[in-house]
From Swiss-Prot:
It comes from Serratia proteamaculans (strain 568). This is Glycine--tRNA ligase beta subunit. It holds the Pfam family tRNA_synt_2f. GO terms for cellular component: cytosol. SUPFAM superfamilies: HD-domain/PDEase-like (SSF109604). InterPro entries: DALR_anticod-bd, Gly-tRNA-synth_bsu, Gly-tRNA-synth_heterodimer. Tetramer of two alpha and two beta subunits. It is found in: Cytoplasm. Keywords: Aminoacyl-tRNA synthetase, ATP-binding, Cytoplasm, Ligase, Nucleotide-binding, Protein biosynthesis.
Length: 689
């Protein structure tokens, strides 16, 4: 069967830059699934994405589906006909579904009986007949949060569509997609190359777009060009460009023909904290800041134009004029804010609502101040500095700088606190209180900063759960999942001695009578343990390993971490599987028993050699492992417990647990209970698969 290249390009208005990659990747994935579902053989599916187009190119696409043999078994003969030999309703319904009458059906005879059978040779449809519908289906499934209409059409898409091109080799595939008829015409760059031109063959794409339209359709090529040229431009002025992945992706999504240029701003603006300048350059203007070898911001920036100009200096001057007022605003705000102390903003926090039922930001500040001090006392941080940081934690939200440049919250608090002469760890804590902001983000460095970060997040968790506004599905408006994981990461990775139970109780206590959910403490702790499960699964720990530990409900995160790692190591031991199975057997035996167990194993009642041996091992191990458990050394404890495999196997091979003699039976059950208790000091390994 002949195979050809298939091309589809959707020409649009400017697509959302932050969604461009995900739209293109989803388009490719959806279309690949359509091809596979239709049994159309194909090679690689490549995607292309630029500001005004989404495209796919499929290599070696079959011209048609393969022919296939279809067999559908119907009702058994006994149910297919009545006593008079007339077809039953079941038989007629089945035949109708197959497009035949009952008397046209074949018979399938096996040693198990006889059934009606429909057998047919189905000729494969041509790709030409299928492709337009498959493209439409693929586009309809794109992850578009908000659709729009244009003109007088009812068609909806992420942006208005102007052209649709579908080619199978040199053949134009007819069809209407998103209200536009398929044609050979594609559009080039707005200001360079040919405005419109036709494509004769799918294999010409994307080269023809490059040559005639001055559009680089390959997303990764544009991104690599920008990265390479920006690095070169920065090194030319003796610096290094801040090419963050997210901004690099966004800029690559904004241009069809990237031209990297270097500009500068007045050195006087460097007196403003670099974070504010960078926020303006990256967030507002999509510029790449440049730093020197020591990491100090230079009075230069790199930007990407979407046109190759005969007079690039004019474009450079234009961008310098655009950014200057924004930098001047930052300078003005910085100087104005410093005319009063950070602490002077406290009264204004009373005018801003944190949450209707939970009070103002000033109320939140008071709670954070108290909780940060409590946490500091638990982890050995400077309590006075932690409470001071708590008091100042939200003051920068009232400054001109943060009001205008919202992403500078925290970092501006740090700069203003330093200006006011606050202790350095207090100032740094104001910046680090929001860390970690995202997966993989850095944690607060000092214990004072950890105290504040934990207090801020726990106050939010306790408050929102306390009024019953739990995260539901994908909706998490207060970012409680991120807050919970942040607290857990800080405690685990900093190895802090904090208990989630008492921490949550303290956070709830500070709300007084504001909270209406009586189960708030338990629900917050369970929610955080659930975050543990998700986190450790991502880290590669087996689900049943995590469940084994969660069965013990350890509320100290550092302790939870040690237990999970211990069980993960235990599973590598040769004895692990047998001991897990034995624990499961013990658990089942104890669950079914109605006997009241003894407080201890009575040596005088032990009869069999195997039970005496097991009891002796347990006594020795119990005493030996006590300091291991006390120190949280669970890994070595489980290694020691692995030595129980032979005596446990011998016990089950040679001892009848449910003996008729009640004293013997209860003593043996007690022995098994003590065995299980020893393992439960670490985890419930009976749940291991």
């Amino acid at each position: 069967m002949t195979q050809q290249t298939f091309l589809v390009e959707i020409g649009t208005e400017e697509l959302p830059p932050k969604a461009l990659r995900s739209l293109a990747e989803a388009f490719a994935a959806n279309f690949t699934a359509e091809l596979d579902s239709a049994n159309l053989e194909h090679g690689e599916v490549s995607w292309f994405a630029a500001p005004r187009r989404l495209a796919l190119k499929v290599a070696n696409l079959s011209a048609a589906q393969a022919d296939r043999e279809v067999e559908k078994r119907g009702p058994a003969i006994a149910q297919a006909f009545d006593a008079e030999g007339k077809p039953s309703k079941a038989a007629e319904g089945w035949a109708r579904g197959c497009g035949i009458t009952v008397d046209q059906a074949e018979r399938l005879v096996t040693d198990k009986g006889e059934w009606l059978l429909y057998r047919a040779h189905v000729k494969g449809q041509s790709a030409q007949a299928l492709l337009a519908g498959m493209v439409s289906n693929s586009l309809a499934k794109l992850p578009i949060p908000k659709l729009m209409r244009w003109g007088d059409s009812d068609v909806q898409f992420v942006r208005p569509v102007h052209t649709v091109t579908m080619l199978l080799g040199a053949e134009l595939i007819p069809g209407t997609v998103l209200g536009i008829d398929s044609a050979r015409t594609v559009r080039g760059h707005r200001f360079m190359g040919e405005a419109e031109f036709t494509i004769d063959n799918a294999d010409q794409y994307p080269q023809i777009l490059l040559e005639r339209g001055k559009v680089i359709a390959d997303y990764e090529t544009r991104k690599a060009m920008i990265k390479r040229d920006a690095e070169l431009a920065a090194s030319t002025i003796g610096g290094k460009a801040d090419l963050s992945e997210s901004l690099l992706e966004e800029v690559a999504s904004l241009v069809e023909w990237p031209v990297v240029l270097t500009a500068k701003f007045e050195e006087k603006f460097l007196a403003v904290p670099a974070e504010a300048l960078v926020y303006t350059m990256k967030g507002d203007q999509k510029y790449f800041p440049v730093y020197d070898a020591a990491g100090k911001l230079l009075p230069n920036f790199i930007f990407v134009a979407n046109i190759e100009s005969k007079d690039p200096q004019q474009i450079i001057s234009g961008n310098e004029k655009v950014v200057r007022p924004r930098l001047a605003d930052a300078e003005f705000f910085f100087n104005t804010d410093r005319k009063k102390r950070l602490e002077d903003n406290l009264p204004r926090l009373e005018t801003v609502l944190f949450q209707q039922q939970l009070g103002t930001l000033r109320d939140k500040t008071d709670r954070i101040q108290a909780l940060a001090g409590w946490v500091a006392g638990q982890i050995g941080a400077d309590v006075n500095h932690a409470t001071r940081a708590g008091l100042l934690s939200k003051c920068d939200l009232m400054t001109n700088m943060v009001f205008e440049f919202t992403d500078t919250q925290g970092v501006m608090g740090m700069h203003y606190a330093r200006h006011d002469g606050e202790a350095e760890d207090v100032a740094v804590a104001l910046n680090e209180q929001y860390q970690p902001r995202f997966a993989g983000d850095a944690l607060p460095e000092s214990l004072v900063a950890c105290s504040l970060a934990i207090a801020d997040k726990m106050d939010t968790l306790a408050g929102i759960f306390g009024i019953g506004q739990h995260p539901k599905g994908d909706k998490d408006p207060f970012a409680l999942r991120r807050a919970a994981l942040g607290v857990l990461r800080i405690i685990v990775e900093k190895n802090l001695t904090l208990d989630l139970q008492t921490l949550t109780e303290e956070a709830v206590r500070l709300y007084g009578s504001k909270l209406t959910n009586a189960k708030v403490v338990d629900e917050v702790v369970e929610f955080m343990l659930g975050r543990f499960r998700a986190w450790y699964q991502e880290e590669g720990h087996a689900v049943d390993t995590i469940q084994a530990v969660l069965a013990r409900r350890p509320t100290k995160p550092a302790d939870f971490d040690a237990r999970v790692k211990a069980v993960t190591h235990f599973r590598t031991l040769e004895a692990a599987a047998a001991l897990a199975a034995a624990n499961k057997r013990v658990s089942n035996i104890l669950a079914k028993s109605t006997d009241t167990l003894n407080d201890r194993v009575h040596a005088s009642v032990l009869k069999e050699a195997a039970e005496i041996q097991l009891a002796t091992h347990l006594v020795v191990l119990r005493d030996k492992l006590e300091p291991y458990f006390a120190a949280g050394n669970y890994q070595d404890a489980l290694v020691e417990l692995a030595d129980l495999r032979e005596p446990v196997d011998a016990f089950f091979d040679n001892v009848m647990v449910m003996a008729e003699d009640e004293a013997v039976r209860v003593n043996r059950l007690t022995l098994l209970s003590k065995l299980r208790e020893l393992f439960l000091q670490v985890a419930d390994i009976s749940v291991l698969q």
